[in-house]
């Protein structure tokens, strides 16, 4: 794969990720303040089912198809019809399941919400084939641009609906808009009209790897459904709303960086023959992910008490420890999981399935532990997040032979600098008046502190990062004339 194309994509992804992080930092607390824990709790009852079904609808074919030549029309056409059928069948299944779930949860308003969200399952299946084509072509920047565009428009829609008093429907509208715009944008970039053929023998080899991916996602989705049920039963709708919002906000923020970098690693690993080259890219992307996610989540954790008071509102005051522990632990855990892209590119899915099963079981145990109640819950879940990431790196050591210490060294500097920045933000937060304005000042001041600490504590790697960025920018400027006609 062209290093020039890879560098150009990395620059675009970096810019898009920065904008997405800023968007999430502003949007999530604003929606939480406008909607309150109860609306988030109602949405959280529907969300695990939707995410669970989406995992099945994907069928794991997206990652597997990226390894297939685009000239093989029998495979691509058969995959398209298979995915479309799955989307329709599973969407109908979601609508039918909403009735029994509303009775079990004693929430009569749940069926129309889930019926509307069922459309997002079909929209997801329409993005899988073009996504696989773009991955195979190495057009990783398209994912970032499409995702940023969809998130901006969907976020604006959610805010508008929330201000109009739409309640939980603001979150429903955001989800449908997000998946709808992704489907439109990605198909506009890489749609190919499928033939009216279906050959199971042609597509079945992809279901082997896809089946392993689905099994891993199935285990994760089932675990989160049970997890939501346990939290809701123990702490009520408001507690579930706080728990679900914190986990979803942290996940969205971190995945805004980890998804594109994981896609970048997978796209390169699929076509690369040199293992050392893939390993080097993995370490660089681990560094990039750490540089972006660790400071953001650390500062949020440091200012969690100010965030709940000034932005989320008094109804969220009991969620301070959740925010303070879930955000940074999610970022650290995700760093370890980045290596799964390289493992999937080799066609190995079993280890990731077992990892997902272990994570789901541990998270379920964490939320079910009675000792300590609500105050202890964040500590248990944070420990599972960290253990999940570390175990993923250990699996990479066993399967790929990559040293654990190398990945930890790439994240060490950003982690230490993030701790310094978080301490500075906390000190400012303690010594400044209340209100959103001073909260923003405290968070913004952590930025230059982070950069200075990074330079002092990890100078060699930081200078190398700066050199790599300048090289990438130079390649980005050179990309347009090279990509055009001679």
Whereabouts are the PLM-identified features?
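N-terminal membrane topogenesis motif
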Residues: 1-24, 66, 73-78, 108-110, ...
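Interhelical loop/hinge segments that connect adjacent transmembrane helices in multipass membrane
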Residues: 1-2, 6, 141, 184-225, ...
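Signature of the first transmembrane helix
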Residues: 3-59, 85-95, 115, 150-159, ...
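Membrane-interface junctions at transmembrane-helix termini in multi-pass inner-membrane proteins
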Residues: 6, 64-73, 123-146, 169, ...
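Alpha-helical transmembrane segments of multi-pass membrane transport and lipid-handling proteins
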Residues: 22, 81-106, 112-116, 156-164, ...
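Helix-loop junctions and terminal segments of transmembrane helices
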Residues: 24, 56-73, 135-136, 246, ...
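Membrane-interface helix-loop junctions in multi-pass transport and translocation proteins
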Residues: 32-42, 99, 103, 111-112, ...
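Membrane-proximal transmembrane or re-entrant/amphipathic helices at the cytosolic face
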Residues: 402-407, 423-486
């Amino acid at each position: 794969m062209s290093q020039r194309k890879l560098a150009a994509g990395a620059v675009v992804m970096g810019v898009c990720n920065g904008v997405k992080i800023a968007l999430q930092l502003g949007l999530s607390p604003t929606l939480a303040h406008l909607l309150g824990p109860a609306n988030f709790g109602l949405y959280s009852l529907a969300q695990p089912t939707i995410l669970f079904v989406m995992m099945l609808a994907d069928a794991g074919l997206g990652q597997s198809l990226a390894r297939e030549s685009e000239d093989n029309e029998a495979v691509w056409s058969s995959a398209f019809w298979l995915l479309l059928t799955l989307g329709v069948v599973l969407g109908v299944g979601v609508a039918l399941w909403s009735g029994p779930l509303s009775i079990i949860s004693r929430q009569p308003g749940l069926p129309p919400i889930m019926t509307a969200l069922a459309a997002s399952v079909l929209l997801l299946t329409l993005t899988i084939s073009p996504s696989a084509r773009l991955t195979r072509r190495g057009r990783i920047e398209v994912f970032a641009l499409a995702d940023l565009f969809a998130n901006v428009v969907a976020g604006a829609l959610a805010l508008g609906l929330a201000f109009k008093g739409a309640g939980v429907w603001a979150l429903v509208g955001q989800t449908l808009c997000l998946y709808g715009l992704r489907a439109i944008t990605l198909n506009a970039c890489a749609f190919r009209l499928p033939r009216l053929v279906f050959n199971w023998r042609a597509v079945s080899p992809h279901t082997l790897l896809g089946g392993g991916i689905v099994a891993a996602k199935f285990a994760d989705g089932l675990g989160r459904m049970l997890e939501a049920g346990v939290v809701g039963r123990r702490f009520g709708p408001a507690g579930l709303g706080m728990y679900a919002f914190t986990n979803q906000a942290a996940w969205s923020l971190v995945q805004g960086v980890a998804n594109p970098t994981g896609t970048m690693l997978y796209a390169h690993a699929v076509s690369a023959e040199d293992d050392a080259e893939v390993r080097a890219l993995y370490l660089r992307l681990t560094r990039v992910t750490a540089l972006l996610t660790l400071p953001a989540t650390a500062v949020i954790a440091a200012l969690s008490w100010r965030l709940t008071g000034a932005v989320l509102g008094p109804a969220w005051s009991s969620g301070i420890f959740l925010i303070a522990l879930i955000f940074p632990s999610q970022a650290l855990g995700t760093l370890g999981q980045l290596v799964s892209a390289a493992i999937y590119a080799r066609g190995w899915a079993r280890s990731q399935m077992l990892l997902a099963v272990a994570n789901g079981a541990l998270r379920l145990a964490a939320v079910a532990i009675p000792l300590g109640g609500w105050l202890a819950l964040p500590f248990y879940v944070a420990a599972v997040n960290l253990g999940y990431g570390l175990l993923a790196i250990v699996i990479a050591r066993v399967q790929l032979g990559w040293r654990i210490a190398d990945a930890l060294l790439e994240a060490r500097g950003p982690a230490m600098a993030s701790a310094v920045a978080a301490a500075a933000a906390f000190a400012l937060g303690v010594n400044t008046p209340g209100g959103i304005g001073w909260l923003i000042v405290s968070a913004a001041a952590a930025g230059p502190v982070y950069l200075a600490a990074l330079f002092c504590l990890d100078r060699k790697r930081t200078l190398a990062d700066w050199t790599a960025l300048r090289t990438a920018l130079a390649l980005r400027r050179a990309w347009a004339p090279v990509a055009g006609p001679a």
